[in-house]
Regions:
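Conserved catalytic or metal-liganding residues and their short signature motifs at active sites
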Residues: 1-186, 201, 217-222, 226-234, ...
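Active-site-proximal loop/helix segment associated with metal-binding centers of metalloenzymes
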Residues: 238
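C-terminal, helix-dominated tail/subdomain
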Residues: 184-215
Length: 275
């Protein structure tokens, strides 16, 4: 940094005298007023400043690798390869949050740290809540991923989670539209149609009862905790409100739900949202 190293010749001479010949890669915070000796000692001893690695709203592991590789030295290919080569890796291990890493973290070290963070996240309290619902942590994350894609309104998440838990208890298909969009791989869909429900996929929760085989995104902490603290009620259906506010209206039976769904369909037609 030209703001710190005022005299390059002086810095190089000091480095030569001290015997500092190699530059070790990393993320270092250089402070104004540092002497050449202070700077060289910091670089030689590898006193890095951690970088904050942030990821959220992630659809899949490939997107995760791309997002993380923008923030540490490891490239997206090495991260993706390391994940695929580790059979013990579950997408659920990567919980969206803000983490601290050294910039020169490699792919294997990144995965190791994320596993440790996953174990830390799933403390005794969360595990006990999952067990009360007869769900494994991985299953909680799968359901949370659906909840996450159903609503952007955090306040609604526990109620929506409660609907799906009620359906699971009855062994009903979840009939979750976001799982169809995931199966189709078309995230431009704004209106799920009957033809979409015919896709042959284990992620089609209209055809297959129970949870899909994996998460449809990396669920947020808010969604995971919404499942673990789901609202207890007698709702089995929900539909987006016809004011298109992003909120939902809930129903206890199919007749009530059909009336709500018809209002929503009319609203979509009014706004010319056909697909």
């Amino acid at each position: 940094s030209n703001e710190v190293i005022i005299n390059r010749n002086s810095f190089e001479l000091t480095a030569k005298i001290i015997g500092y010949n190699n530059i070790y890669p990393g993320h270092y915070l250089l402070k104004d007023g540092m002497s050449n000796i202070q700077l060289i000692n910091m670089l030689r001893k590898g006193f890095q400043t951690p970088v904050k690695v942030v990821f959220n709203n992630i659809k899949n592991l490939e997107q995760l690798a791309g997002r993380v590789s923008d923030q540490i030295e490891a490239d997206s290919l090495s991260i993706t390869t390391a994940i695929r080569n580790d059979s013990s890796i579950c997408p659920c291990y990567f919980i969206p949050n803000t983490y601290e890493f050294y910039w020169n973290t490699d792919a294997e070290s990144f995965i190791k740290k994320m596993k440790a963070e996953y174990e830390k996240f799933w403390n005794e309290t969360r595990i006990a809540k999952a067990e009360e619902m007869n769900l494994k942590p991985e299953e909680v994350s799968i359901l949370a991923s659906i909840v996450d894609k159903e609503t952007t309104k955090t306040s609604e998440m526990p109620r929506i989670a409660g609907v799906y838990l009620n359906r699971l208890k009855k062994h009903w298909p979840l009939q979750a539209d976001p799982t169809l969009i995931y199966a189709l791989g078309d995230y431009s869909i704004h209106r799920v149609l009957d033809v979409h429900k015919e896709i042959d996929s284990p992620y089609n929760t209209y055809k297959h009862a129970g949870l899909p085989p994996g998460p449809i995104c990396l669920p947020s902490i808010a969604a995971i905790d919404a499942v673990l603290n789901a609202e207890r009620h007698k709702y089995f259906y929900f539909c987006a409100k016809d004011d298109l506010s992003g909120y939902h209206v809930f129903a206890r039976n199919i007749n009530e739900h059909n009336r709500n769904a018809e209002k929503y369909r009319r609203a979509l037609n009014k706004h010319k949202i056909y697909k």
